[in-house]
């Protein structure tokens, strides 16, 4: 049975700033897939979906009661999550037709911030973000066209994963601007957001914008170059300015290096979304309904859609050409940086202030978001700190199309470094868990254990990452090996040799997986006296790994007592020359 929060009608507006306004409808009992495996990857996790996403048997309202229709089938992404064992508990409020970044543009009521009900929650995926922040669900789906999957995350101390365009099917989603729409994921940890993405992604032949995207599986460098706008705008909000500086310091503590970038062309691209003929796609998405029922659409959404109706085809072509020219201008940025870092939202806005000046205040919230989908980038909003006034602050990590897993790796490190609790629940951050590894599909692969200069962050690690290798885990060898520092090797390398039972030790190794097609060229780079052989891990399994000829050990220092190459290198750095 569907339960609406007013217990009378699905179309009665909820009170402004009422926490119940986060929901448009709840399901009782929750919806589950009876055929889902009990040990599915999302088994038992409770989730909600933004009410512009179809769920069979439920009305889809897009926060416009007159527009509502009964969905005959699940959206592709909903079906995939249910099949993975997740349990659907309701549909959430949004800025009408996903047109806004603030969460107040809904006849069902304004969704308040989870930390202070006087402030906006951010939108348009307002309800989804709030119910994750408050712990009512484990994760939720939103959509993101101009920042709707990121701004609410940043304002509510949760993670907002905005995938590469077409990575998650948008079939069964009411379009906002279909060519750049993305289904987004809200969770309280990066790890869970990545788990949901691993289930949700995949091509869909019934979605014209779905893509079978190759994902970058090599982790970002341990010391990434982070691009930061040379000029920043916080609209007079000193607390947010200080919080962003603190966030950058956290990244630097993780080894990142700041690189100033020119934000002007990105800002110009952002402006195209609403200040050019590109806004016509907003109108086209709901043209038939809007032309017949314009009065049913609330302001300022009505004005935005009407603006889109005024443009002609030639205007749209001009805007697209301008976008491509700006994209060409921006592209060289990626030669100098590994990731772009911006404030998710530059300020917090009260509901009162938003209603007094809805266009300007909404535009301010999107100062660092609107360009991302137009340029086909991936993005991840990560909480980093609480401001001096106790309100949440987060940054968005942005990378090229297909960098989703790379951003998740860095985002997880940054989130854990923050020391924050989860959302508005007060729950402590759990121990870091390994992110799910994106599947290689039908591509044959080889696993190899590395022990020395090929470890993450070491000089030869690039020989793995440039071949598309993925770091699976850090583990230890079986206690059958000894480790030696080989003299005269550049860069310095160890030699690992198998010894008789009782004479060896368990040594730290990393297990990587790479496409088989790249394995031969990797092995060809290994110089004598090193080679590849079979190595036994502490769990008894065997993988390919680095071995060393015993003749090369003459004059080599036995460093087995360090337990691994990284600790040996660290000990040398700590010892005065």
What residue spans do the PLM features occupy?
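Short helix-loop capping/hinge segments that flank enzyme active sites or metal/cofactor-binding pockets
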Residues: 42-64, 223-225, 277-331, 383-391
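ATP-grasp fold ATP-binding core
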Residues: 40-56, 88-91, 172, 227, ...
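Gly/Ser-rich, acidic/histidine-flanked active-site/gating loops
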Residues: 47, 53-56, 80, 182, ...
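Glycine-rich, small-residue loops and helix-cap segments
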Residues: 44, 83, 134, 138, ...
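Short Gly/aromatic-enriched secondary-structure transition segments
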Residues: 61-68, 460-477
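Short glycine/serine-rich loop segments
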Residues: 74, 79-197, 373-396
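Short, well-ordered alpha-helical
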Residues: 1-70, 75, 97-100, 244, ...
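A short helix-breaking turn/cap at a secondary-structure junction
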Residues: 33, 162-242, 265, 409-412, ...
